[in-house]
């Protein structure tokens, strides 16, 4: 039995025991309360996949029986089984106390009347009351922005209007009756979260869907006099009206009123009382449906509005109608009090007396008197007026099919006939609003956008690109999309990049999977243009992706660019959705790259070379070393460390004859022709990325946990080691750390160093010979002391040398313009054996910015001093060449710890390193807030050399660079490290 089945079986027993112990049963609310009191936790609805208590009990027909009552309440009673029949019979024989009965009745009354009512509602008639126009206007105003869940309705209403919704004072018993009374403007849709209240779409949209069916025409059955009263004695010829049974069904009955009012009364008197009431109700419904919203306005108010508009024969701007009305009649005209959302909806309802036009050059609609003839300029051939519904059009106009036929499909000579018929009887047929054909397209799109587009949808925003990486930065990467070795896209693999992208995609899937949200964020046709940022769902994997429209292929398909993965694909227009603004904070994760220091053997890459490169990349994380940027394209070295031997891609391509290794990066031709990322995105704001700061994550600089510089190599040292070590790639390097290397709140290196370089650098980098010239004394305000080693090689065939390869510490000192002196001390080492540590991790102290490296060197012929030296560096960076190191503090093991240290000038450093037992590099804390850096070299390294990592935290793990070092057995855990004090 699974865990879910066990929980469900236990829940069935608990619910049966609760309901059996209650003779009169419990309501769903009381059941939830009793369960909480008995068990101490709420009903496990979500665990079992239920949305409500009623859904849970309905799924237990053998445990619970549901007993609905006439007042709307529901009582749940238990169905006893074989083991509980005796208990149920005993409970049934109990005497019911009056106190319990009265409390149950009070509970039912409170459920029926709702939370907003605590007093007894007086008795009323059979029919529910009519919702006041002011209340209906408030409901429309509340739902105009976005749909609201019924459970959140009370909070939203209080937040919007500052008071609770007291539906009892309007004569309603429940919110259900309120929604029924407002069914003409509010629709209720059942969702997974509950009942969702939505504002109904305009009648024009419903008519465009084909309602009423068959193109039946509706005309007003009762003629309205000029004063607004109905004529009861005059006959009405051939007037029709229908009985709409529901909002979505077509009319089923067509009653022909062809006789006088007296004959109708005689005919209806033969029917029984029920049929009379039904017929009268249907008649009223039909008349109200045909009159439209304008029928609720009093005739006097209509006359006043018409009088105001008639004073402006050239047209009155619709925005000035309320002000002119107040000036003339000294009273305010409030559309909301009349039940309308705004003045446009009010004018649309009064289309039997008003006419609306939109002219080029005008920023607003013009309102005219319906009986006044339009001015001659409006009758020109270029400005043909067409009928269009605005806001809430009246229902007593011609159907959509008839309007389309008379305005678009009919010849121009027949187009004036319906106009003449309508002008003869302005009070019978409500004239729809009229707009010109040649409306400014941008203005129309703007109006549609403001009305239909969600407020948090992205319209013209661009994504940011990731900030540029520093040279020699170590990153874990995924190769996402490959065109050739000179044109591919990578994605950074780290906690602050790939995991953020995964979290965002999960949130997007959860958001857009809701059908209501998906429909609301549908991308309209006029937004589908190149460069627009949106999102799309791939039907194969059901995930949602951020995309940028690249090209429109036709009526149904578009070509999109995926800024997080780099590829271009074809999708359907119907699958495009607006992207929410919250999903634009994460920068585009794809980085256009080119493999560094390689070029094809021929002019272009062969298919075999591309296939081989694809096999090397695969679907696995790789280690990348940043070389440089060429025309905005990242040139990077790639290495696969998943096997015992490190596989360098440039070496494999060269070995198989697909590429030529060169010492310079050739610009990518493919990215020169097309680089969608540079075309559709913008550069980031800087190293301290503001976007990620807003998200609450570390800055974009922390994506890579590293800041590096390249230690320059002198030409003389390059020549001295050229014969011993083959040319190749720089070794992977260590990274900067703070108090704890895994602390996400450490500051970037640039923030600590400042612009003037007034503090010692924290960088320990590998040298890259010939990459950058070493600065002279004129270029440096203070002297730099650089510890550099020979150039290391990225080659699978390279192994550490035997006993003759030792530790080389080379000191470069500037004596004059370009003069250099070298003092080298060497010790011979063997391959270090593994070291095991049994110390408790909690006893190990944390190190602050503590670095060390494995130094490849050669023994010097010069003598040595037996005492160790301590170097206090000036306020310039100290650079140390390293082998492949991890992102954690490390030190060289020493059997004997010599802590002696003296200050020495640059001239006294000439022969210090040949026999140094310990070298400590630190800064005086009195001159700055920087902590010390320590490098410990013990005499033990004359026999063997080991690279150790202190276990500063229990959750420490090796980074990408350290994995490269461990593959060569150059890295071991350090048992204990003592902090060096200045």
From Swiss-Prot:
Positions bearing Phosphoserine: 894
Domain named HTH OST-type: residues: 7-80, 127-202, 297-371
Keyword Ribonucleoprotein: no
Matches recorded under SUPFAM superfamilies: Tudor/PWWP/MBT
SMART domains: TUDOR
Major location (coarse): cytoplasm
Compartments, record wording: Cytoplasm
Residues annotated as signal peptide: none
Domain Tudor: 527-586
Gene3D superfamilies xref list: 2.30.30.140, 2.40.50.90, LOTUS domain-like (3.30.420.610)
Nucleotidyltransferase found in the keyword field: no
This protein's GO CC annotations: chromatoid body; pi-body
Region (Disordered): 816-838, 882-912
Extent of Polar residues compositional bias: 901-912
Keywords for the protein's UniProt record, in alphabetical order: Cytoplasm, Developmental protein, Differentiation, Phosphoprotein, Repeat, Spermatogenesis
GO BP field: P granule organization; spermatid development; transposable element silencing by piRNA-mediated DNA methylation
Record-linked InterPro entries: LOTUS-like, OST-HTH/LOTUS_dom, SNase_OB-fold_sf, TDRD5_LOTUS_2, Tudor, Tudor_domain_containing
Family note: Belongs to the TDRD5 family.
Its biological purpose: Required during spermiogenesis to participate in the repression transposable elements and prevent their mobilization, which is essential for the germline integrity. Probably acts via the piRNA metabolic process, which mediates the repression of transposable elements during meiosis by forming complexes composed of piRNAs and Piwi proteins and govern the methylation and subsequent repression of transposons. Required for chromatoid body (CB) assembly.
PANTHER family linked: TUDOR DOMAIN CONTAINING PROTEIN, TUDOR DOMAIN-CONTAINING PROTEIN 5
The protein's name in its UniProt record: Tudor domain-containing protein 5
Source species of the chain: Ailuropoda melanoleuca
Organism taxonomic ancestry: Eukaryota, Metazoa, Chordata, Craniata, Vertebrata
């Amino acid at each position: 039995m699974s865990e879910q089945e066990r929980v469900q079986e236990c829940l069935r027993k608990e619910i049966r025991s609760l309901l059996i112990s209650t003779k009169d049963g419990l309501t769903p609310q009381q059941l939830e309360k009793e369960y909480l009191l008995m068990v101490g936790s709420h009903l496990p609805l979500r665990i079992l996949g239920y949305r409500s208590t009623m859904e849970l009990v309905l799924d237990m027909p053998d445990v619970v029986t549901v007993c609905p009552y006439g007042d709307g309440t529901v009582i749940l009673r238990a169905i006893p089984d074989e083991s509980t029949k005796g208990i149920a019979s005993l409970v049934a024989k109990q005497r019911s106390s009056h106190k319990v009965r009265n409390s149950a009745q009070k509970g039912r009354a409170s459920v029926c009347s709702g939370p907003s009512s605590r007093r007894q509602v007086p008795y009323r008639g059979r029919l529910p009351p009519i919702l006041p126009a002011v209340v209906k206007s408030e409901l429309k105003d509340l739902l105009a922005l976005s749909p609201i869940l019924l459970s959140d309705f009370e909070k939203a209403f209080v937040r919007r209007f500052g008071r609770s919704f007291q539906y009892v004072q309007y004569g309603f018993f429940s919110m259900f009756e309120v929604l029924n009374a407002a069914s003409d403007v509010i629709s209720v849709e059942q969702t997974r979260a509950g009942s969702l209240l939505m504002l109904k779409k305009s009648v024009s949209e419903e008519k465009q869907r084909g309602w009423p069916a068959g193109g039946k025409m509706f005309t007003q059955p009762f003629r309205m006099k000029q004063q607004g009263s109905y004529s009861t004695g005059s006959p009405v010829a051939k007037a029709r009206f229908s009985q709409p049974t529901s909002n979505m069904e077509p009319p089923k009955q067509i009653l022909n009123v062809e006789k006088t009012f007296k004959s109708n009364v005689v005919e209806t008197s033969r029917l029984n009382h029920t049929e009379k009431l039904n017929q009268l109700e249907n008649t009223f419904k039909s008349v109200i449906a045909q009159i439209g919203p304008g029928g609720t306005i009093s005739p006097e108010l209509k006359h006043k509005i018409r009088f105001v508009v008639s004073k402006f024969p050239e047209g009155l701007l619709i925005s000035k109608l309320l002000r002119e009305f107040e000036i003339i009649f000294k009273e305010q005209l409030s559309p909301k009090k009349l039940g309308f959302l705004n003045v446009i909806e009010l004018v649309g309802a009064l289309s039997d007396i008003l006419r609306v036009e939109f002219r080029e050059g005008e920023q607003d609609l013009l309102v005219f008197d319906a009986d006044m003839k339009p001015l001659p300029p409006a009758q020109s051939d270029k400005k043909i007026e067409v009928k269009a519904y605005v806001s809430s059009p009246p229902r007593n106009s011609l159907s959509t099919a008839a309007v389309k036929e008379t305005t678009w499909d009919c010849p121009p000579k027949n187009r004036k006939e319906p106009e003449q018929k309508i002008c003869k009887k302005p009070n019978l047929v409500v004239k729809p609003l009229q707009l010109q054909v040649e409306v400014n397209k941008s203005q129309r799109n703007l109006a549609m956008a403001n009305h239909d587009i969600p407020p948090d949808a992205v319209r013209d925003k661009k994504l940011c690109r990731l900030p540029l990486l520093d040279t020699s930065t170590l990153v874990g990467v995924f190769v996402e999309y490959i065109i050739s070795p000179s044109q591919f896209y990578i994605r950074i693999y780290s906690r602050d990049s790939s995991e953020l992208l995964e979290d965002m995609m999960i949130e997007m899937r959860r958001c857009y999977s809701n059908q209501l949200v998906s429909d609301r964020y549908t991308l309209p046709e006029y937004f589908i243009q190149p460069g627009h940022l949106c999102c799309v769902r791939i039907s194969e994997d059901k995930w949602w992706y951020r995309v940028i429209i690249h090209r429109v292929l036709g009526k149904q398909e578009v070509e999109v660019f995926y800024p997080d993965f780099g590829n271009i694909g074809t999708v359907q227009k119907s699958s495009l959705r607006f992207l929410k603004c919250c999903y634009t904070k994460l920068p585009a994760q794809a980085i256009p790259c080119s493999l560094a220091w390689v070029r094809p053997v021929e002019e272009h890459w062969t298919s075999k070379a591309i296939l081989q490169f694809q096999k090397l990349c695969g679907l696995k994380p790789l280690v990348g070393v940043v070389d440089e940027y060429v025309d905005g394209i990242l040139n990077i070295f790639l290495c696969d460390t998943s096997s015992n031997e490190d596989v360098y891609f440039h070496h494999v391509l060269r070995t198989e004859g697909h590429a030529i290794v060169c010492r310079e990066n050739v610009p990518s031709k493919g990215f020169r022709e097309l680089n969608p990322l540079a075309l559709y995105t913008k550069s980031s704001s800087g190293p301290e990325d503001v976007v990620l700061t807003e998200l609450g994550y570390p800055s974009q600089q922390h994506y890579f946990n590293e800041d590096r510089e390249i230690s320059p190599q002198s030409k003389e040292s390059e020549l001295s080691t050229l014969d011993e070590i083959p040319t190749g790639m720089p070794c992977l390097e260590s990274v900067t750390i703070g108090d704890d290397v895994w602390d996400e709140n450490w500051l970037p290196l640039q923030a600590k160093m400042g612009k003037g370089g007034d503090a010692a650098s924290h960088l320990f980098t590998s040298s890259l010979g010939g990459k950058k010239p070493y600065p002279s004394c004129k270029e440096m305000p203070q002297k730099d002391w650089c510890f550099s080693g020979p150039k290391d090689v990225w080659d699978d065939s390279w192994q550490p040398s035997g006993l003759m390869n030792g530790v080389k510490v080379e000191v470069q000192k500037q004596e004059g313009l370009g003069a250099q002196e070298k003092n080298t001390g060497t010790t011979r080492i063997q391959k270090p054996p593994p070291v095991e540590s049994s110390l408790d991790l909690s006893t190990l102290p944390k190190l602050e910015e503590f670095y060390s490296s494995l130094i490849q060197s050669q023994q010097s012929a010069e003598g040595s001093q037996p005492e160790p030296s301590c170097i206090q560096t000036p306020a310039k960076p100290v650079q140390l060449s390293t082998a492949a190191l991890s992102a954690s503090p490390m030190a060289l093991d020493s059997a004997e710890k010599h802590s002696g240290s003296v200050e020495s000038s640059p001239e006294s450093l000439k022969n210090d390193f040949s026999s140094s037992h310990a070298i400590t590099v630190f800064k005086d804390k009195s001159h700055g807030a920087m902590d010390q850096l320590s490098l410990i070299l013990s005499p033990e390294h004359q026999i063997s050399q080991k690279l150790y990592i202190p276990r500063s935290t229990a959750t420490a793990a090796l980074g990408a660079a350290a994995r490269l070092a461990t593959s060569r057995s150059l890295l071991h855990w350090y048992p204990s490290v003592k902090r060096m004090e200045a």
